[in-house]
């Protein structure tokens, strides 16, 4: 009986049709991957991407030069220099982040009392030279201006958990 069954299965190509059916089931199923450069997956409001310095609605920068972010940074990637202004407040004259040292832990964002330094939604910031990964105050403010709407929305969504 075994030989007859084996001959019958071989003649009807049962193994082939079984494998073909399995392949067709996955061929028409929903794709599990994305076509990355053209499609992007959803990001969490807590996503930690490229750093940015924010401004108030009137255009004044938020950073009060408290240097908490510099003190808490475990990688020592942040360098801040400040000087007093005529009204007695402090403002930064230099705010640099060495992105080659940064470990994207988010401590700088958590330590900031005025939400001046944030990690934005951008994760595509490859560079050809090492110098391009040293962000100065102008570059950080530019990032903040570019993504302010998304950053504000993400901070609002994350507010209940802070």
Swiss-Prot record:
Q: How is the cofactor bound?
A: Binds 2 [4Fe-4S] clusters per subunit.
Q: Which UniProt keywords apply?
A: 4Fe-4S, Cell inner membrane, Cell membrane, Iron, Iron-sulfur, Membrane, Metal-binding, NAD, Quinone, Repeat, Translocase, Ubiquinone
Q: Which GO terms describe its biological process?
A: aerobic respiration
Q: Which residues bind [4Fe-4S] cluster 2?
A: 73, 102, 105, 108
State the membrane topology.
Peripheral membrane protein
Got a GO cellular component term for this one? Answer: plasma membrane
List the EC numbers from the record. Answer: 7.1.1.-
Which prosthetic group or cofactor does it need? [4Fe-4S] cluster
Enzymatic reactions: a quinone + NADH + 5 H(+)(in) = a quinol + NAD(+) + 4 H(+)(out)
Does the entry feature the keyword Transport, yes or no?
Answer: no
Spell out the subunit comment.
Answer: NDH-1 is composed of 14 different subunits. Subunits NuoA, H, J, K, L, M, N constitute the membrane sector of the complex.
Q: Supply the name of the protein.
A: NADH-quinone oxidoreductase subunit I
Q: Which organism is it from?
A: Maricaulis maris (strain MCS10)
The taxonomic lineage of its organism, from the top, reads: Bacteria, Pseudomonadati, Pseudomonadota, Alphaproteobacteria, Maricaulales
């Amino acid at each position: 009986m075994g030989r007859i069954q084996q001959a019958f299965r071989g003649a009807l190509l049962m193994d082939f049709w079984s494998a073909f059916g399995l392949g067709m089931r996955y061929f028409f199923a929903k794709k599990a991957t994305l076509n990355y450069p053209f499609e992007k997956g959803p990001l969490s409001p807590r996503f930690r991407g490229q750093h940015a310095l924010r401004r108030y609605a009137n255009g004044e920068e938020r950073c009060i030069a408290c240097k908490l972010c510099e003190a808490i940074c475990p990688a020592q990637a942040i360098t801040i220099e400040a000087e007093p202004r005529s009204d007695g407040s402090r403002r930064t004259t230099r705010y640099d982040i060495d992105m080659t040292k940064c470990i994207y832990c988010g401590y700088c964002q958590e330590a900031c009392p005025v939400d001046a330094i944030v990690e934005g939604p951008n994760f595509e910031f490859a560079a050809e030279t090492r110098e391009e990964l040293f962000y100065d105050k102008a570059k950080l403010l530019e990032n903040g201006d570019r993504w302010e709407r998304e950053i504000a929305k993400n901070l609002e969504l994350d507010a209940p958990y802070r």
